[in-house]
Amino acid sequence: MSNGKQTAHGPQLDVPIRAAVVSSWADRPGDVYLAACRSFLQPGDTLEAVKPSQLADGGFDMVFVTQVCGYSALPAKVAAASLPALCLEPCRGYHPYHAAFYRELRARGGTCLPALLPEDVAASVRAVRSRRALRGMKLLVFEPHGDGVRTAQLNAFGRACRERFGVEIVVRDTDELKARAARFDARAADAELARWYAEVFEGPGEADPAYLQDAARLYLAQREALAETGAVGVSPHDIAGFLTIPQPVTMPNLSYGPLVFDGFLVCEEGDAEMLVTELLLQAGLGARPTMSNIYFAFRDRFSALASYQEYTAEMELADCRQCFEDNRITLAHFSTSGVLPPEMMVEPRFKIRKTLPSWPAQAMIAATPKLGPVVVARLGEQASEIHLEYGEADARATGDQYGWYRGRWFIRLPDARKFAARCFHQHYAVAPDPGDHRCLETLLRDLLRLT
């Protein structure tokens, strides 16, 4: 079985799977049971009826258990094969005959896939498919070398991702990215800019020609590195590698718009944990997320000001109190709403805005986020925990008078206090919520064993 595909358009999750089917009553399940199993598979998938003793060496992704009633030898053999399992009757609904099998499989540390109703089985199979697709995927992080603490964190996180998910974090130096970009001439940059204006941006916006050429070169450099590594997402450390060096240079942030339009996962600040979170959310939801800073501030007191410079500590405390009172958090990043994928944008294209007031020489993509139900999440630094919340983006606030926070949006949560008590970091991923969480929850909780 091949690993998850990697294309020029980001994660490819619709990969074939191999499923086994076993019976506790016969060497081969009856045709009616096989038909029930096949009804949940796609063309290209493999379904093979095997003896329980053959499970461990068959290269299977999951097992359908049929014709089981009460206690049997099956749980021990399925657990030994380390395969996620579900029980299936011809009616494709839950039967109490399955209870003893599930109970013993759990006791042996095995994985029981949800299968109460046909829609639960379908979601479980989708989760297994996404789990298979994740194996072998790569994500690219550009980080300035020299920070020993962060290097150690990235190495530990990368090992955990390989072991738990089969996902590889490829870490390169930001100096390499800049050197790659320098190899592209003005002609190549201008050709790329022409495509951007035709497909991605409304126009050059607030950036000057030289800055735009630099941004195009950085885009071409990232595309080159993505192609070489086979990575499906990228996160350059745009601050430490470009902005806060002795002589600041053009940040790669404008390039993120074309990259997400291409289909890649993208996040800022070399945040590997965030990039993997985005990948997991896309695998479980089928929708691409964005990333943003979250705040318990910048609410009504801030919105009433004529200038961000008038914001006092007392006002910020009042806004913090408001967040806990009405269970909302504020999102903003680089003076915009973040790197929104096209499906999360109100407009068909990005604008180019200067990152005022903090970095007047830099520019960032800007778009208006769509409102509606969302999933908010972040993976822990050991890749063993995930903070996952369901909420609703229900308001926006824009205006140049708000400076660094001129592109705010607000998410209503079930309980802001509980969110703060578990909060992992200032960066969180936000994805559109399709309303059905079964595949996501099965992938994260049952298959990847994230707590």
Model-assigned labels for residue ranges:
Residues G10, S39-T46, V50-R135, G146-A156, ...:
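Cofactor- and metal-binding active-site motifs of prokaryotic enzymes
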Residues R103-A287:
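Conserved, well-structured core segments that form the ligand-binding/active-site neighborhood
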Residues V339-T451:
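Extended hydrophobic packing segments that form well-structured cores
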Residues S39-T46, K51-M62, A198-Y219, C423:
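Metal-dependent C-N hydrolase catalytic cores
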Residues V266-G391:
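Long, charge-rich C-terminal accessory regions
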Residues S2-T46:
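N-terminal basic/disordered segments at the start of proteins
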Residues P29-F40, H98, L154-N155, A215-Y219, ...:
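Well-ordered, non-membrane alpha-helical segments in soluble/globular domains
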Residues R18-G30, V65-C69, E89-C91, F142-G146, ...:
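Structural motif
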